Amino acid sequence: PQEAPFTISELEEIYPAASAKSKADEVFKERAHQATLKLQRGYAPYRAIWQHIMAVSVADLKKNYANLNVEFDLWKGESDAEPYIGDMIQMLVDKGLAHESQGALVVDVAQDTDTKEIPPCLVRKSDGASLYATSDLATIVEREQDFKPDRYIYVVDKRQGMHFEQVFRVAKKAGIVKEDTPMIFLGFGTMNGKDGKPFKTREGGVMRLEKLIEEINEAVYQRIMENRTVSEDEARSTAAVVGLAALKYGDLSNQAAKDYVFDIERFTSFEGNTGPYILYTLSLIHI
């Protein structure tokens, strides 16, 4: 199809529904595996749908980042590393680093100095499909070719620490990256609701950034309108600025690696250690 046959909201419903169905239905799960394999091998109909998924997703990401005044020089997806995967896998085999284990291809990365178990890094499934580690390694190959970085810094969910430890070790063991090149993992925690669990909507779904910004702006707007000293339009425009401060300061004022509770009521307060209070204080200084 020329136009995307779905919206970002529909995609957000399809993905968890398909994930849940694959856990309960083995036949469906196998069909999903086969579809993934065909997609990775370039099957045109699946690639066309995938292109629409990418376009819709990236457009939504760019819109949300624009709301936060955040820009990126490059927008690179996991699939950008795909052309490098075949040669990289062959290189791992030729160097004797990758070997078969239960039909899959793995690279041993454990070291004598390890204080905990580091499992082998799985780089190809038994059906020939690629995994996250495969793409991450191929991405490093691409970055070495294009940028030759002095160091790598990965800012990712802290729960991915083991994964990237494996990837970094394979990259250095295979000579993709020089042994003395720093490869740093900076893990961050999750933003949780008052119940201590990852933020969700009132309906129980995953909280989208766009929805979170809307709720924060509305909370700030209601606080501004309590004094009834400004027009509704002024209150809305002010709420957008103050709401952004509440979100950014609420997030950045916590230790990056720790999970924390994002309490909208507290973080939108004009009192205490909050973004709105800092803006309020700044406005008084300039009076």
Predicted regions and their residues:
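NTP-dependent nucleotidyl-transfer catalytic core
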Residues: 1-285
